[in-house]
Amino acid sequence: MKKMKKYDAIIIGFGKGGKTLAGFLAGKGQNVALVEKSDKMYGGTCINIGCIPTKKLVDSTKVLKNKGLSGIEEKERFYTESINNKNKLIGALRGKNYEMLATKENIDIYDGFGSFASKNVVNIESNGENVQIEGEKIFINTGSTTIIPGIKGLKESNHVYTSTSIMELKELPKKLTILGAGYIGLEFASMYADFGSEVTVIDLAKRLMPREDEEIADRA
């Protein structure tokens, strides 16, 4: 039986916190294992599904305005190009984040789903196979998942997207309804309206950006 590999630290999650901590501990001479279940999430939310891709698309809408495109077919083609350009950008950044740690001798990166087998042992499941590693210290940097509201039929629909999945949609939606008038919902509403979608925003609150100060919300 293959001997279980031991580490000074195991970090579950290759996000902003995980990658920074891994680099810091490795710099102190510790042997580090970094576990990530998705090869699309090296570097975390900001790089892959948050700040950078959304701002790249927002910037694309400014280019669209400057080009003066008005026809729906022109806008649809431009939107598809914008999604492809966004994917190229985050792919490059994701690769840089991976190489930044993968090239360090005392960091091992495991692709797979990490779970606790015991207090100091992590089981990593990948492609039907399991590997177990042991760590003196274990850090959890798993982030969060999207919550789908409990509206009847919503989870079963093929036309429901999250803020993550809609940015993979290569065909511009003609009509788009956004549930939630917070800053994320409004960013997507503004962005897709600029691309050419007909957008409706729905929220239980009486005003936009209900979690923000009224002075800020009034400027939305």
Features from the language model and the residues they span:
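Rossmann-like NAD(P)H-binding beta-loop-alpha module
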Residues: 170-208, 212
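Glycine-rich flavin
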Residues: 4-7, 24-30, 36-172, 205-209, ...
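Residues that cap or flank secondary-structure elements
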Residues: 13, 89-90, 180, 212
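Hydrophobic residues in beta-strands of the RecA-like P-loop NTPase core, especially within AAA+ ATPase
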Residues: 12, 35, 141, 178-179, ...
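Beta1/beta-strand and adjacent pyrophosphate-binding region of the FAD-binding site
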Residues: 3-15, 172-182
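N-terminal Rossmann-like FAD-binding beta1-loop-alpha1 element of flavoenzymes
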Residues: 8-34, 185-194
